[in-house]
Amino acid sequence: MTRLRFLISRAMRQEAPVAALSVSRLKLLADLNERNVALVGNARSLSEKALGTEIDAADIIVRINRAPMPSAVSHGTRTDWLALATSLSDDDLERIKPHRILWMSHKRKRLSWNIANSEGFYLHPLEDYERLKQQLGSPPTTGAMMIDLLSQSGLGRLTLYGFDFFASLSLTGSRTADQVPHDFSAEKRFVEDLMARDQRISLT
C-alpha cells in the first residue's frame, strides 16, 4: 500500500485496507508462546519501587503509550512492544525504540503512516475494543486492552507492573480519575477476576 492510499483509507474510515497492514492476531499471539511477559503501566507508584532489573529480565517487555521511564532502577530500560492509543512524536519513538508497535485505539485517524508501515505492526480489531467496552461499561484503557489481549495467548507468565488503577495517577499527566473517560473500579475488578481464573497472571 502507498502512503497516499493509506491516508485516503484512513480518512474515509475504510477499515480493511488499513487492517491489511497488520500482522494477524494469530501471528502476534504465537510470538508470546511460553514467554515471560512484563506489561508496564504508567502509574506514578512504580517510580517508588526498584523493579527495573526484574522488568528487564522478562522475555518480552510491553509498555504503554508514552512509556515513561524516569529511572532504570524503577522501570528498566528495554521496550519490545509498544501499545499505543495516542500519537507519538518521532523523538518519543526514538527514545522508546520499540521492536513492534500495536495500535490499540479505535480512533484510526490518529494512526500515522510511519507506524502503520513499521515492521511487525498490529492493529487491534474494533470488535475487540467494543467487546471490552461493553464488559467494563466504559471505554477501556490501553492497559486493560493489553491485559485482555495478552491473556488470550499461550504465554508462560504475565506480570503487571505500574498498575494501581489510577490510585497514584499517571506519570504522563496530571488528570484525576474524574477527568478521564475510564472506570478504574471496573478495570480493577476485571483484572482481579482474570487473575483468579488464570494463575499465569500476577500484579506486582
PLM region spans:
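Metal-ion/cofactor- or nucleotide/acyl-coenzyme-handling active-site neighborhoods
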Residues: 1-204
